[in-house]
Amino acid sequence: MSSIDKKELAKFEKISHNWWNKDGEFGLLHRINPIRLEYIIEKITAHYNRHLSKLEILDVGCGGGLIAMPLAAQGFNVTAIDALQSNIETASTYAKENNVKINYLQSTIEELESDKLYDVVICIEVIEHVGNVQQFILNLVKHIKPNGMAIISTINRTKKAYALGIIVAEYILGWVPKNTHDYTKFLKPSEIYEMLTDTDIEIKELKGLVYDPAKNEWKLSDDIDVNYFMCLGSKNAKSINVIPALAGMTS
């Protein structure tokens, strides 16, 4: 069974040529990308504490390569997959134009070579757009090496997330196109926790991403009511920051 949601794919296929237009439909992602990358690199460095160029990263649902490109430029060995061929074409063209080496593949997580494991699996702003979420997440964590890690981000299913993530972001401020998000697809951290119960993977850290209107900037926060990052790792490995993770299980 595939985790693809054809309606979601159709939405992104229409704008797949525009990933690198900072003033286009993906403008918000460009604005939050620096803080996203800062968090990702910080967590990978803390987890491995060794030279980054030797690490293999899988970027699932890579889109136009907004995360894959700068990670590869940092020295990571990046494989990036996306279900949309048009996304892969846009990403590959941009990487070639900028002389950045990335292994781009048009593939779903289910179609990916099953025995290929990675030091880090990344899935940023994707799971709120897939069909069978539990299947998707279980397939995702299967590709983590022993003692490896995963970093995912998504949107919490709260009234605050509906107000800010849909009403304000889509209909008032126009930060993203209308109908980009479906509130019913938002996920509480506790739901992901339950999905991982029968695996050897657990949540190691939760961290929120919030907008500060006074400073007109995005920043990391312990507020996970809307956007949040989640670090995953082996249940036998030391937690990165277990207190926020445990606190988040009530959300």
Curated annotation (Swiss-Prot):
Record flagged with keyword S-adenosyl-L-methionine: yes
One MF annotation (Gene Ontology) recorded for this entry: 2-polyprenyl-6-hydroxyphenol methylase activity
Listed pathway(s): Cofactor biosynthesis; ubiquinone biosynthesis
Pfam families assigned to the protein according to its UniProt record, in alphabetical order: Methyltransf_23
CDD domains: AdoMet_MTases (cd02440)
Entry keyword Nucleus: no
Any one GO biological process: methylation
Top enzyme class: transferase
Sequence positions that bind S-adenosyl-L-methionine: 36, 61, 82, 124
Recorded catalytic activity of this chain's protein: a 3-demethylubiquinol + S-adenosyl-L-methionine = a ubiquinol + S-adenosyl-L-homocysteine + H(+); a 3-(all-trans-polyprenyl)benzene-1,2-diol + S-adenosyl-L-methionine = a 2-methoxy-6-(all-trans-polyprenyl)phenol + S-adenosyl-L-homocysteine + H(+)
UniProt entry keywords in alphabetical sequence: Methyltransferase, S-adenosyl-L-methionine, Transferase, Ubiquinone biosynthesis
Entry EC no(s): 2.1.1.222, 2.1.1.64
PANTHER family in the cross-refs: METHYLTRANSFERASE (PTHR43464), UBIQUINONE BIOSYNTHESIS O-METHYLTRANSFERASE, MITOCHONDRIAL (PTHR43464:SF19)
Family: Belongs to the methyltransferase superfamily. UbiG/COQ3 family.
Annotated NCBIfam families: UbiG (TIGR01983)
Function according to Swiss-Prot or TrEMBL: O-methyltransferase that catalyzes the 2 O-methylation steps in the ubiquinone biosynthetic pathway.
UniProt-recorded name of the protein: Ubiquinone biosynthesis O-methyltransferase
Native source organism of the sequence: Rickettsia akari (strain Hartford)
Gene of this entry: ubiG
